[in-house]
Structures are given as structure tokens and as C-alpha cells.
């Protein structure tokens, strides 16, 4: 596990972009795994501004809210189109289908996509409770793409994106921890003091399902990029 501490979110995002650009330019990255939320927004803005050619790169996404259509402004389809896909050309882009009513079939479909498009670099954020994707504490390390019940803390953290608290979905489709760990390389981004405890447990704590991100200690190629605040408890 390589640890990089930077001055702020912009510097950390640029460092992540350097790694991604190098992989794409060298031809080593055919599939790029993407995350959502506030953490990668600056990375995507920098990627849009960059000259790197992504026309031959396929993207996959970690998760999507259950019950939200792709054109819903709160869906991750909308988020990705708004911040990245409408501004940068990719070969193909895949996300779970939030409108799928057969959860088992949807999860199997998405695992099939991941099998066809093995992830070369997976970008991750981390929740204040140590979740990666929407894999909440207690999730099996052997989990594949699954339908998850969102914890109160996760819904609380995400309510700022919604007009009303009751509009925050209660479930999501998420790549499982095993699905994430199958990526050849992982870049974990964390910015802000509110992520410091989760980062401490991820890097310094035991590998334990109560901190899902701690499983990254077992991955052969992980780069953790932090700002000074997120690194403050290390």
C-alpha cells in the first residue's frame, strides 16, 4: 500500500490523474472503475481538462441508487453524465440499473459486465464509517455485486444531495468487496477531517468487516491519496 499525502483536494486529485493518465497512455488501462460522491468531483474536472485520449477506455461504476431513473438528477447516471461523460468521450460506460426490479438478475448482469471488462484501475472514495462503494460495515469480503440496505449514517451523509431527507433512497446496487478487490490497481481518495478516523482504521487497524476499506491492506497494488486533514490521525 502506497500512501501519498498532499496539501489539499486539488493536489490529491491531480496526483490521482497522473496515475490514471500514465496507465491510459501506456495502454495498460482499458477499463477504468469510477466512483461518485463529492470526493472524485475534482478528479473528474481535471480529467475533462486534460489532453489524455479516453476514446478507447471503457468505464464501470461502483453503484447506483435503487429506484432512481438514469435521468433523475440524484442518480449516479446523471452525476456521471453531468461531470464527465458529456464532456469526455469514452468507448463504453456501464453503471448498475437503478430501475431494475429483479435484484438478482441485475446483480448477475453487472457481474457479467465486470467479467467481460476486468478493471485495470478502480477509483474509490471512503465513507466516514469505512464503507467502499455502498458496502457497509459487516459486508462479507467475498461479496459480489448485490443490493444493499443503506445505513442511517450513509443516508445522513448523502442527504445534502437531495431536497428532502425522505427522498434519500434506502437501497442501492453496489459492486461487492470481492468485485472491487478484483481490480488490478486501486486508488483510494480521501479528503477532509471527517475522513481521518476511517483512514486511520483502514491503514492502521486490523483487517475487519466492521471497516470494509481495511480489506485494501490485502490488495497487492493500492495507492492511498490524502490531504493533510484526512491524514491527520496517521
Swiss-Prot record:
Gene Ontology cellular-component terms listed: cytoplasm
Key word Hydrolase present: yes
A single GO molecular function term of this UniProt record: identical protein binding
GO biological process: carbohydrate metabolic process; glucosamine catabolic process; N-acetylglucosamine catabolic process; N-acetylneuraminate catabolic process
Keywords, alphabetical: Carbohydrate metabolism, Hydrolase
Superkingdom of origin organism: Bacteria
Residue positions of the active site: 63, 129, 131, 136
Listed Pfam families: Glucosamine_iso
InterPro entries: Glc/Gal-6P_isomerase, Glucosamine6P_isomerase, Glucosamine6P_isomerase_CS, NagB/RpiA_transferase-like
SUPFAM superfamilies in the cross-refs: NagB/RpiA/CoA transferase-like
EC numbers on record: 3.5.99.6
Reaction catalysis annotation: alpha-D-glucosamine 6-phosphate + H2O = beta-D-fructose 6-phosphate + NH4(+)
Secretion signal, residue range per the UniProt entry: none
Class of enzymatic activity (EC top level): hydrolase
Family according to the record: Belongs to the glucosamine/galactosamine-6-phosphate isomerase family. NagB subfamily.
UniProt protein name: Glucosamine-6-phosphate deaminase
Organism: Listeria innocua serovar 6a (strain ATCC BAA-680 / CLIP 11262)
Amino acid at each position: 500500500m502506497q500512501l501519498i499525502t498532499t496539501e489539499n483536494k486539488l493536489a490529491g486529485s491531480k496526483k490521482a490523474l497522473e496515475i490514471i493518465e500514465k496507465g491510459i497512455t501506456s495502454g495498460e488501462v482499458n477499463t477504468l472503475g469510477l466512483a461518485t460522491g463529492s470526493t472524485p468531483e475534482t478528479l473528474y474536472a481535471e480529467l475533462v481538462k486534460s489532453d489524455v485520449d479516453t476514446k478507447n477506455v471503457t468505464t464501470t461504476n461502483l453503484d447506483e441508487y435503487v429506484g432512481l431513473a438514469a435521468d433523475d438528477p440524484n442518480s449516479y447516471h446523471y452525476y456521471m453524465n453531468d461531470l464527465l461523460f458529456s464532456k469526455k468521450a469514452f468507448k463504453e460506460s456501464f453503471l448498475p440499473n437503478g430501475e431494475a426490479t429483479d435484484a438478482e438478475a441485475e446483480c448477475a448482469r453487472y457481474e457479467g459486465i465486470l467479467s467481460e471488462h476486468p478493471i485495470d484501475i478502480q477509483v474509490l472514495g471512503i465513507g466516514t464509517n469505512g464503507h467502499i462503494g455502498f458496502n457497509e460495515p459487516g459486508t462479507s469480503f467475498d461479496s459480489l455485486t448485490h443490493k444493499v440496505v443503506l445505513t442511517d449514517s450513509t443516508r445522513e451523509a448523502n442527504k445534502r444531495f437531495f431536497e428532502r431527507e425522505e427522498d434519500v433512497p434506502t437501497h442501492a446496487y453496489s459492486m461487492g468487496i470481492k468485485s472491487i478487490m478484483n481490480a488490478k490497481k486501486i486508488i483510494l481518495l480521501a479528503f477532509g477531517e471527517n475522513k481521518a478516523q476511517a483512514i486511520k482504521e483502514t491503514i492502521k487497524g486490523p483487517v475487519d468487516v466492521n471497516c470494509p476499506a481495511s480489506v485494501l491492506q490485502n490488495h497487492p497494488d493500492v495507492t492511498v491519496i490524502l490531504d493533510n486533514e484526512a491524514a491527520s490521525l496517521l
